[in-house]
Amino acid sequence: MTSQSIMLLVAFLGVLLALAYPLGLFMAKVGDGTAIRGLGWLLKMENALYRLAGLDTQSAMSWKSYAIALLVFNTLGALFVYAVQRLQAWLPLNPQAFGNVSPDSSFNTAVSFVSNTNWQGYGGESTMSYLTQMLALTGQNFFSAATGIAVAFALIRGFSSRSAKSIGNFWVDLTRSTLYILLPLAIVVSVALMGQGVIQNFSAYQDVALVDPVTYQQAKTTADGQPVVDAEGKPVMETLTAKMQTIAMGPVASQEAIKMLGTNGGGFFNANSAHPYENPTVFSNFIEMLAIFLIPAGLCFTFGRMVGDMRQGWAVLGAMTLIFVVMTSIVMTSEQSAHPAMQALGVDQTTTALQSGGNMEGKETRFGISASALFTAVTTAASCGAVNNMHDSLMPMGGFVPLVLMQFGEVVFGGVGTGLYGMLIFAILSVFIAGLMIGRTPEYLGKKIQSYEMKMASIAILVTPTLVLVGTAIAVLVESGKVGIANPGAHGFSEILYAFTSAANNNGSAFAGLSANTPFYNTMLAIAMWFGRFAMIVPILAIAGSLACKQRLAANAGTMPTHGPLFVALLVGVVVLVGVLNYVPALALGPIVEHLQLFSH
């Protein structure tokens, strides 16, 4: 790591902590339902929304009622997003006259945005109208994030309640999360990004003449975007000359803000946050990274405040930060090292005052190695998936890091809400293991952890590895899966493993070398995204309901402290161990083999 990388990482974590602490305390008030001083006007708006919807806000929900309401709301959201895409050609705010999106791509995109994954098998600026981007996709960026916060609130109430039958009201949690947290933050970040040059308009795309025409070759494709191959299976190339360039416009800043704050990640443009209209400067890049981690980090303090012991929140945040710093150091070091293939060509990859050095393939020169590597770690530690560089061009160990961060279960800060409740599931597993070692019934925050909680926790932990490994196995076995591989060998396998890892863990980033906009991958990845999201949420709500019914016991001499360095070390060990055990064989076939092959020559 260079001194620049170290300084950037320290500055990032310092600013994050300074902002996340007060936000976490504020979110605790939102979760508790208490009145917030100075925001009486928002309370009036909130109550007006309840009256408009005919909701009884005093009606408490059991965990089953909460889960049903959540599933119904998100299913209706998916149907709405699907319908908007399928009717896009006849709807307004479509200056480029884009046609209707295909059924399989619409299905994949609807599930993707509702599940907070934002996997994109399409190019936003060449597929989606402004209305689709704003009404369907940006809308779900808010609602999917609010759903995650609501589930986190419900689980926290399970720990903090005493012999309660309710874990809250889903509709209230959804409304308050959107109104008090997501909307205000999105407005602030949108304005900040516009100040840095992120565009926000409804203009038609602009056609401009190039100063120098560009002649280039590209693989020929069919009408549906599939590569044309010759008799030997090699891609057929065609020579093209570009004299004009079409510059895409659109309401980008408003979508960019919630894309980051909600750990959604779906870009307005195909290049995502590598595009200069989404992320034009190093300062906008820093803002976007902060926005990704801000709410997940703040929720750790929310957890501590709502359970009545801030040390618990610090312990969870400490475990997350420790893993994050180690993994970020690996990707920074890996990307700063010289690429052997470039060395063989005599390319200068040393770090100087005039260049970042290292592996600059697939990276933006305005960001360089340090900011690109940090963004890579941030976006995959959180279930965001936005990218400011091409992950497919990372060094083998550089690509190993985002894969592993996702395979930990997106609990290293993780998504909005999902990171906290995912880490709390690992905390439950940790105290259970500790209880087995000392022969005592495990407790966490005064609640006994018994067989029911462990069964539900096991389901929540195992559902995503099952989806990832089974999906990857099917894709490499069937012809429709193998035809999408552009890079044979270990890297091609890594691309498929990355796709299913990203989908099942609701991240959304990709190794872009995989041709994933096909009926096979659109369907398979949509299944992984849906069950990766909701097959985890339901058992977590079941745990919340079970814990809420229990008395909160006072700590005694035999109670294991869950706020000190020993527990943090145990929690980190359990997260790493479960991730390693689940995925080591698959990782050995992908990035590890690729690393050995690259450096063996």
From Swiss-Prot:
InterPro entries: KdpA. It comes from the Bacteria. The keyword Kinase does not apply. Keywords: Cell inner membrane, Cell membrane, Ion transport, Membrane, Potassium, Potassium transport, Transmembrane, Transmembrane helix, Transport. The chain crosses the membrane at residues 6-26, 65-85, 136-156, 179-199, 283-303, 313-333, 367-387, 397-417, 419-439, 458-478, 524-544, 566-586. One of its GO terms (cellular component) is plasma membrane. It is found in: Cell inner membrane. It is a multi-pass membrane protein. HAMAP family: KdpA (MF_00275). Part of the high-affinity ATP-driven potassium transport (or Kdp) system, which catalyzes the hydrolysis of ATP coupled with the electrogenic transport of potassium into the cytoplasm. This subunit binds the periplasmic potassium ions and delivers the ions to the membrane domain of KdpB through an intramembrane tunnel. Belongs to the KdpA family. This is Potassium-transporting ATPase potassium-binding subunit. It comes from Herminiimonas arsenicoxydans. The gene is kdpA.
